């Protein structure tokens, strides 16, 4: 019934890794084709740390659906149920909720994403994730709740680590995604991802996920191969935000300009 694959769910079912590209700067949906060419599996469309509009997010999400890259959208903190429903109705296959501190926060996230009786999401007919097909309402609810409304909660503070087990126990939560930059900053060790305290925090989240059958994800460890390998092999992380479009442009621009600047003008023209 669902028109498009939830790559994260399918890969996770067989223990494989889902690689996401963050989009927070580029508004042209053609960025999705670049992501596909590079081998990404999913999109992390960022409405928290960007000025992307709801229309931008929908256009990029629908391009992702058509290209086989599962679109997830990070919404602004405490943006409200109405906004989340617009994002889902616009084509997102999952919502990423930042700054989840308690089990109550996690339950509210689930409540926002799922149709009754599992939540309070309002019904709408032609869903992009169902190919805009006219679909019986009970089928929309069943299919969307099962495979097209993933709930990703972000663990980004020390108090969230303390509540990781309770958060992971919430029915309907699919992924505990550690926001490494905010977490390390909140712990007073900003960017010190090698810290024993930071690693212990990640281990606590991994253990909670394993106990309750949830997926662990990581964001913010960009281009950190050593820690990414540790997280995938030792912590069983299966969802990785690999990089942001803005960082790729910045790094590529510096490399390109630096290569030209390094050319020595030591010969006079003939």
Swiss-Prot record:
Top-level taxon of origin: Eukaryota
Name of the protein this chain belongs to: 4-hydroxy-4-methyl-2-oxoglutarate aldolase tasA
Cross-referenced InterPro entries: Aldolase/citrate-lyase_domain, HpcH-HpaI_aldolase, Pyrv/PenolPyrv_kinase-like_dom, Pyrv_kinase-like_dom_sf
Cofactor, how bound (note): Binds 1 divalent metal cation per subunit.
Protein encoded by which gene: tasA
Subunit (UniProt): Homohexamer; trimer of dimers.
Site (Transition state stabilizer) location in chain: 74
Cofactor field: Co(2+); Mn(2+); Zn(2+); Fe(2+)
Record's function text: 4-hydroxy-4-methyl-2-oxoglutarate aldolase; part of the gene cluster that mediates the biosynthesis of the tetramic acids Sch210971 and Sch210972, potential anti-HIV fungal natural product that contain a decalin core. The PKS module of tasS together with the enoylreductase tasC catalyze the formation of the polyketide unit which is then conjugated to 4-hydroxyl-4-methyl glutamate (HMG) by the condensation domain of the tasS NRPS module.
Transmembrane intervals: none
One Pfam family recorded for the sequence: HpcH_HpaI
Annotated catalysed reactions: 4-hydroxy-4-methyl-2-oxoglutarate = 2 pyruvate
GO molecular function: aldehyde-lyase activity; metal ion binding
Record key words, sorted: Cobalt, Iron, Lyase, Magnesium, Manganese, Metal-binding, Zinc
Protein's UniProt keywords contain Transmembrane: no
A single cellular component GO annotation: cytoplasm
Binding-site positions, a divalent metal cation: 156, 182
Catalytic residue positions: 49 (proton acceptor)
Binding, substrate: 182
Record-listed E.C. numbers: 4.1.3.17
Species, as recorded: Hapsidospora irregularis
Entry similarity comment: Belongs to the HpcH/HpaI aldolase family.
């Amino acid at each position: 019934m669902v028109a498009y694959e939830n790559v994260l769910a399918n890969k996770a079912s067989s223990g494989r890794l889902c690689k996401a590209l963050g989009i927070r700067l580029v508004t042209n949906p053609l960025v999705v084709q670049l992501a596909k060419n590079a081998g990404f599996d999913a999109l992390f469309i960022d409405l928290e740390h960007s000025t992307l509009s709801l229309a931008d997010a929908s256009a990029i999400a629908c391009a992702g659906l058509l290209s086989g890259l599962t679109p997830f959208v990070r919404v602004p903190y405490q943006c409200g149920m109405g906004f989340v429903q617009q994002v889902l109705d616009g084509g997102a296959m999952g919502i990423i909720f930042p700054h989840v501190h308690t089990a109550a926060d996690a339950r509210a996230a689930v409540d926002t994403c799922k149709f009754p009786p599992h939540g309070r999401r309002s019904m709408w007919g032609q869903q992009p994730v169902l190919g805009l097909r006219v679909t019986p309402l009970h089928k929309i609810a069943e299919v969307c709740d099962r495979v097209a409304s993933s709930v990703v909660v972000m663990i980004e503070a020390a108090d969230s680590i303390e509540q990781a087990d309770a958060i992971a126990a919430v029915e309907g939560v699919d992924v505990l995604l550690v926001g490494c930059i905010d977490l390390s900053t909140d712990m007073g060790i900003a960017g010190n991802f090698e810290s024993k305290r930071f690693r212990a925090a990640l281990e606590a989240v991994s253990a909670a996920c394993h106990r309750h059958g949830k997926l662990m994800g990581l964001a913010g460890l960009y281009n950190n191969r050593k820690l990414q390998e540790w997280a995938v092999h030792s912590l069983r992380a299966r969802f990785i935000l690999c990089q942001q479009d803005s960082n790729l442009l910045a790094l590529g621009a510096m490399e390109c300009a630096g290569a030209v600047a390094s050319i020595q003008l030591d010969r006079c023209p003939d």
